[in-house]
Amino acid sequence: MVVKAEKPFAAGGSIEMQLDGGNYEIRPASGDRIRISFGGNTGSATADVTTVGTHANLAIKDTPHNNFKATVEVPQTTDLVLHLTAGNLEMAAITGNKEIDSKAGNVTVAVGDSNDYSSVDASVAMGNLEAGPFRRADSGIRNHFTWSGRGKYTLRANLGAGNLELKNK
């Protein structure tokens, strides 16, 4: 993996990500920073991060259509809004609100403790929905569930076609 972009960013902020198709891993950074690394076939892909106060915009564009991989490291406590064109996403347990949209692919989100959430809204138009921490599993067409708890964070995940898995770790 080759580092393509890196910026300091304090924990507790919010990051909005626009990701072209590919295989992505989102995980906690070793400190208060955003770091983007590319691997596999990087082609002419680019990474851009802009920050204003406690908000950051991150874009990965012009990704090739075969074997593109990227790792995005963010502070352990961060609110995330993520838009993925298509591909595979694996998100480690990041503390904060999460909003994830993907048209197609496989999305796996480590939610940590389900008691940290006040509301969960997850849907898959065509495919499998596994949400073990929230005691829910469905497959087929138009899978959707909502869940309410006593925590302070929200999780919204919407996938067009593929598999959506919400897991503890």
Model-based region annotation:
Residues 69-70:
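Gram-negative (and chloroplast) outer-membrane scaffold detector with strong preference
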